[in-house]
Curated annotation (Swiss-Prot):
Residues 474-666 are annotated as: Linker. GO terms for cellular component: cytoplasm. Residues 676-893 are annotated as: NBD2. InterPro entries: AAA+_ATPase, ATPase_AAA_core, Clp_ATPase_C, Clp_N_dom_sf, Clp_R_dom, ClpA/B, ClpA/B_CS1, ClpA/B_CS2. The keyword Ligase does not apply. It is found in: Cytoplasm. Residues 3-289 form the Clp R domain. This is Chaperone protein ClpB. The gene is clpB. Homohexamer. The oligomerization is ATP-dependent.
């Protein structure tokens, strides 16, 4: 049932128009074609806009539809007239038949009564033995039955004749006086071929039946909606209800009409829209959009959002908001444009103005104004046909002019320059210029400094219509106040408490480390993410427990597999392993905390109950299922209570924010933990695991890292800058790699630049990027891009003396100010990098030191050589470069003693590679000494030693593995005997050693 009370005023207007059209056509029913015409007559109806959006001319379509319906109505009138005449004739004939049938039925009634009388008399005669009377009565009865059969045959003949015209059940009802003549004729009309034909055309059958019935019976039908239109309106009601709308809008009626493909209105609209293919899409939403005014379609009412409390509070920015108000109150040039870096709060200023307008905290001239935020992307999206974008924008501006109290806010206002400007079209800026010049519209814009310069300033006609308001980044104190104002919103959203120290951390840490973004945006993001992470940590299961649960699940699958294979021994082992993991999980749950443990346990119980409920339902045990559901409900209630208790305890701290900032930048900014403190104190020992000797170098590097991690480094300079001098192969590059591995867990995290690649003056472009107009400008520089991606890193400038002097000039500001500007004008932050430069300058003086001398002589000679090296360094590098380096470290040449230690490190690396095969090698002292002797060269350092091990250990070992002499799992001892290296399995070597010692003991005894 449809209720007109549910329809909006505009919907009722269209329905009234449809009724008017039906009356003009002398129709007694309002059908879908009348509704279609009513919607098409209004150029602003959702249906008219919808078809025009698809490139269909509304007026042309309306004309074609009207002509088609006019011709159809003429044909229908003729068909109705003919059908009515046929039915009138049929009615006359039926009336005659009915009269004859009446006579026959009267005769039959008389015969029936006579038969009843004879049967009574016959029974009486037989009872009293009057056989003569009985025979006479029987003869009379037979004559009556013969007459009755004859009359019934006549009736059957009439029934057969009527059945050729009417339905048999209708004829039967008619003959039994259950159906009148008019009823029979109406039944015939409903089942006539004419009605079937109009159904195919999509015309509601009751509309034609009413017209024919009026002519046949002379009774005027009631004026109402047709069956088909009633169905369409019911569908529209359903759509409105499903969308939660209080009233049925024209968009719902239009969508229901388009979807009613069996009606004449639906058929006509679907034919022009492209039929089934087009209608696969849901058009309701699109029609709903077409129903809105241009402002509602392409804009958001900020005043309305402010009334609903959906805008964040705006703290501070008094100067900028007042400046915007002043410009809006001007007589001319009253269009402010907010210019500032991304993230400084330009949009927030406009939202603050909207809140002031709603709260009546503005001058009277602005109190009735509405601020609408316009989405340029929505204006452009879907404008497939030429002129469609201009039409949308023009309609929007016309509505703004008509309303008179609208201020448009266009975020990223530079997008209006060139927007929609296809071949032969005018862009949005040029469409808006005349209205801006005449003061017909007021616009607030927002854009960045670069884009203002690039787009707005390039167009003087557009620029002079706007008055810029420059928005600076707020100070740390102002940002703290902003975050305190936002705190209630964030706490309510995340269900956590945010401490003052977390707010302070968000501002200070992002200010210092997130240099590529602006306050307050970056501070808000850091605090928001920290709150989200805090909530997730408590609600989610800890990663360690998740990992154990994964292992338990995998073991369960293996247990089932072992059971199926009949491997019961393996099954038992797996069960023991599973029990250990379960115990470990329980211990971890206990460590996590009582509440977390209870929450995890409850969740597990609920999961188990779900399985049991499912099993009970499958078995049909409804009583057990109900019991389990009650138990589950209790557990869920308890779980909810525990989670609420836990959320009350959640407080976002400094460390939470620091963790987020560390993740963003890769810089460790969280407070030092006990474990990390111990690691930093033992940094020298860790570095010495890879670098032999060079105590002074290792100590200098470790101290620089400790200063940075303790927060004592100069915040305007890199963590440390070193120049490593010394001959090749003494550990300069190795120390850099070891440092990178300690800091990042991987020596590949080192940003390494071989300075021999930068011999030419123009190779500076490789480091900071090619200048504009040159090939590779878009790619950026090797150094600047690497540091932008990893601001916390170790930069190794290998063989620095081989670079062009002009390339070294580039590093002056890096070493002093910790910053470098790339070819795109972006400032890259080097304040969290360790810069290590290596060089071989003056290494000839170091090689002259007698390495076999005693330690005192060695140290004295080293100091003399060191002075000469530093003197020579001054000849290669300018004083301003040397002066900016934190520490110049001269590496000592390696002695035989150090090389022996290096062999141990190199063999350890070989064992790491062999670990996959479970093979291990050990060197005897004789083998070690011989390798040092063969691999020692003071001029080349430790590198020849690596080649010696490769030649005398790795190559023979590989041959023996391939031949099968050394198998997986073996430990091999490498010894030096009789001028060659021998490889002996450890068991055999131990046996030989024992035999030798035994024989030597015997000799002693003898």
């Amino acid at each position: 049932m449809i209720s007109e009370n549910l329809f909006s005023a505009k919907s009722l207007e269209y329905l009234e128009k449809a009724k008017e059209i039906a009356r003009e056509n002398k129709d007694t029913k309002v059908d879908t074609d009348h509704l279609l015409i009513a919607l098409l007559l209004d150029e602003k109806s959702p249906l008219s806009k919808y078809i025009e959006k698809r490139g269909i001319d509304r007026k042309e379509f309306l004309k074609r539809v009207s002509e088609y319906l006019e011709n159809l109505n003429k044909q229908l009138e003729k068909a109705i007239e003919a059908e009515a005449q046929n039915l009138i004739n049929l009615r006359t004939q039926i009336m005659e038949v009915k009269s004859n049938i009446g006579n026959v039925q009267t005769e039959l009634s008389k015969i029936r009564k006579a038969k009843e009388r004879i049967l009574r008399e016959l029974e009486y005669a037989r009872r009293y033995g009057d056989w003569w009377t009985a025979e006479t009565l029987e003869l009379e009865l037979r004559q009556l039955e013969a007459t009755e059969q004859s009359i019934r045959r006549q009736l059957e003949q009439v029934e057969k004749s009527l059945s050729t015209v009417f339905a048999p059940e209708d004829v039967k009802a008619f003959l039994e006086n259950k159906l009148s003549i008019d009823g029979l004729i109406r039944k015939a009309l409903e089942k006539s071929p004419l009605i079937e034909q109009v159904k195919e055309l999509g015309i509601s059958p009751d509309r034609i039946i009413d017209k024919v019935a009026e002519k046949v019976f002379g009774k005027k039908p009631t004026f109402d909606y047709s069956q088909y239109l009633t169905q369409v309106l019911e569908k529209a009601q359903d759509k409105a209800v499903s969308e939660g709308e209080a009233q049925v809008q024209p968009s719902h009626i239009s969508a229901a009409l388009i979807e009613a493909k069996d009606t004449i209105g639906g058929k006509l609209i679907n034919q022009v829209l492209g039929g089934e293919k087009e209608m696969k899409k849901d058009v309701t939403q699109e029609l709903k959009e077409e129903e809105k005014s241009p402002l509602e379609r392409f804009g958001v009412n900020l005043n309305e959002l402010a009334r609903q409390g959906k805008l964040d509070p705006v703290i501070g920015r008094e100067r900028e908001i007042n400046q915007v108000i002043e410009i809006l109150l001007r007589r001319t040039k009253n269009n402010p444009v907010l210019v500032g870096d991304p993230g400084v709060g330009k949009t927030a200023i406009v939202e603050g103005l909207a809140q002031r307008i709603v709260n009546k905290e503005v001058p009277p001239e602005l109190q009735d104004k509405e601020i609408w935020s316009i989405d340029m992307a929505s204006l452009l999206a879907g404008s497939k046909y030429r002129g469609e974008f201009e039409e949308r924008l023009k309609a929007l501006l016309d509505e703004v002019k008509e309303k008179g109290n609208v201020i448009l806010f266009i975020d990223e206002i530079h997008t209006v320059v060139g927007a929609g400007a296809a071949e032969g079209a005018v862009d949005a800026a040029n469409i808006m210029k005349p209205a801006l010049a005449r003061g017909e519209i007021r616009v607030i814009g927002a854009t960045t400094v670069d884009e203002y310069r690039k787009y707005i300033e390039k167009d003087p006609a557009l620029e002079r219509r706007f008055q810029p308001v420059f928005v600076d980044e707020p100070t740390e104190e102002q940002t703290i106040e902003i975050l305190k104002g936002l705190r209630p919103r964030l706490e309510q959203f995340h269900k956590v408490k945010i401490s003052d120290e977390a707010i302070e951390a968000a501002v200070k840490l992002t200010k210092r480390y997130v240099t590529f973004r602006r306050l307050p945006d970056k501070a808000i993001d850091a605090l928001d993410q920290a709150a989200a992470r805090k909530k997730l940590k408590v609600i989610g299961t800890p990663p360690e427990i998740q990992e154990i649960e994964r292992k338990i699940k995998a073991l369960e699958e293996q247990i089932i597999e072992a059971n199926l294979k009949g491997d019961y021994e393996k099954e038992a082992q797996l069960k023991i392993e599973k029990a250990k993991l379960e115990k470990e999980k329980q211990e971890l749950l206990g460590k996590v905390g009582g509440v977390e443990a209870k929450i995890a346990e409850l969740k597990k119980k609920i999961e188990e109950l779900d399985e049991k409920i499912k099993e009970a339902a499958e078995k049909g045990d409804y009583e057990k299922e109900a019991e389990l559901k009650i138990e589950k409900a209790k557990l869920e209630k308890e779980l909810k209570k525990l989670e609420q208790e836990k959320s009350k305890e959640l407080v976002v701290t400094w460390d939470d924010v620091a963790e987020v900032v560390s993740e963003w930048t890769g810089i460790p900014v969280s407070r030092l933990k006990e474990e990390e403190m111990q690691k930093l104190l033992k940094l020298e020992d860790e570095l010495h695991k890879r670098v032999v000797d060079q105590e002074h170098a290792v100590k200098a590097v470790a101290e620089a890292i400790r200063r940075a991690r303790a927060g004592l480094k100069d915040p305007k300079r890199p963590i440390a800058s070193f120049l490593f001098l010394g001959p090749t192969g003494v550990g300069k590059t190795e120390l850099s790699k070891a440092l990178a591995e300690l800091l990042f867990g991987d020596e590949d995290a080192l940003i390494r630049l071989d300075m021999s690649e930068f011999k030419e003056e123009h190779s500076v472009a490789k480091l900071i990027g090619a200048p504009p107009g040159y090939v590779g400008y878009e790619e950026g520089g090797k150094l600047t891009e690497a540091v932008r991606r990893k601001p916390y890193s170790v930069i190794l400038l290998d063989e620095i003396e081989k670079a062009h002097p002009r390339v070294l000039d580039l590093f002056l500001q890096v070493l002093d100010d910790g910053r470098l500007t790339d070819s795109h004008g972006r400032t890259v932050d080097f304040r969290n990098t360790v810069i290590i430069m290596t060089s071989n300058i003056g290494s000839q003086y170091l090689l002259n030191i007698p390495v076999d001398a005693d330690e005192e002589t060695l140290n004295r000679e080293f100091e003399k050589a060191k002075e000469k090296v530093l003197e020579e360094l001054k000849l290669y590098m300018r004083p301003e470069f040397i002066n900016r380096i934190d520490e110049i470290i001269v590496f000592k040449p390696l002695t035989m003693r150090e090389l022996s230690k290096i062999i141990d490190l190199l063999i350890a690396n070989v064992n790491k590679r062999l670990a996959e095969r479970n093979i291990k090698i050990e060197l005897t002292e004789e083998a070690k000494k011989e390798l040092v002797r063969r691999g020692y060269d003071p001029a080349f350092g430790a590198r020849p030693l690596k080649r010696t091990i490769q030649k005398y250990v790795e190559t023979p070992l590989a041959d023996k593995i391939i031949r099968g002499e050394i198998k997986d799992g073996m430990t091999v001892v490498v010894d030096y005997k009789d001028g060659e290296f021998v490889f002996i399995p450890k068991e055999e070597y131990e046996k030989q050693k024992a035999e030798v010692s035994a024989s030597s003991e015997e000799k002693k005894e003898s």
